Amino acid sequence: MIRFILIQNRAGKTRLAKWYMQFDDDEKQKLIEEVHAVVTVRDAKHTNFVEFRNFKIIYRRYAGLYFCICVDVNDNNLAYLEAIHNFVEVLNEYFHNVCELDLVFNFYKVYTVVDEMFLAGEIRETSQTKVLKQLLMLQSLE
């Protein structure tokens, strides 16, 4: 099960935080800082999986952004690594070559993409076509 999803830049600024487990605000801030500290110092030669507390962080770096998913230790690493890649591809298609500013200024759309792809801490949809179709339909309602 997914505990939380974070998108952070190299400076540690959080661009998206989606929580599927209840944490108080101080704990959330501490987790954000710890995840950034763990992920940013890792060499590109290392795996994209990190043991973290009683969980596991699965992350992928795209340009200057780190896409991180915290999951249970027994979950499938590769499934979540592929889910991150799928998520980035959907964002790239939806925003026509996504960049960090798209995430900042269109954060509500990014949360919509997350909600279309993940539900209650599980991967909900893996078809990029279906997700994009749903997003375009929602956009037409605006």
Swiss-Prot record:
Entry's Gene Ontology cellular component terms: AP-2 adaptor complex; clathrin-coated endocytic vesicle; clathrin-coated endocytic vesicle membrane; cytoplasmic side of plasma membrane; cytosol; endocytic vesicle membrane; endolysosome membrane; intracellular membrane-bounded organelle
Quaternary structure, from the entry: Adaptor protein complex 2 (AP-2) is a heterotetramer composed of two large adaptins (alpha-type subunit AP2A1 or AP2A2 and beta-type subunit AP2B1), a medium adaptin (mu-type subunit AP2M1) and a small adaptin (sigma-type subunit AP2S1). Interacts with CCDC32; the interaction is direct and mediates association of CCDC32 with adaptor protein complex 2 (AP-2).
Purpose of the protein: Component of the adaptor protein complex 2 (AP-2). Adaptor protein complexes function in protein transport via transport vesicles in different membrane traffic pathways. Adaptor protein complexes are vesicle coat components and appear to be involved in cargo selection and vesicle formation. AP-2 is involved in clathrin-dependent endocytosis in which cargo proteins are incorporated into vesicles surrounded by clathrin (clathrin-coated vesicles, CCVs) which are destined for fusion with the early endosome.
Membrane spanning stretches: none
Family to which this protein belongs: Belongs to the adaptor complexes small subunit family.
Listed Gene3D superfamilies: 3.30.450.60
Protein name per UniProt: AP-2 complex subunit sigma
Keyword Transport: yes
A GO term for molecular function: clathrin adaptor activity
Lineage, highest ranks first: Eukaryota, Metazoa, Chordata, Craniata, Vertebrata
Record keywords, A-Z: Cell membrane, Coated pit, Disease variant, Endocytosis, Membrane, Phosphoprotein, Protein transport, Transport
InterPro entries linked to this entry: AP_complex_ssu, AP_mu_sigma_su, APS2, Clathrin_sm-chain_CS, Longin-like_dom_sf
Primary localisation category: membrane
GO BP: clathrin coat assembly; clathrin-dependent endocytosis; intracellular protein transport; postsynaptic neurotransmitter receptor internalization; regulation of endocytosis; synaptic vesicle endocytosis; vesicle-mediated transport
Originating species: Homo sapiens
PANTHER family in UniProt: ADAPTOR COMPLEXES SMALL SUBUNIT FAMILY (PTHR11753)
Bilayer topology: Peripheral membrane protein
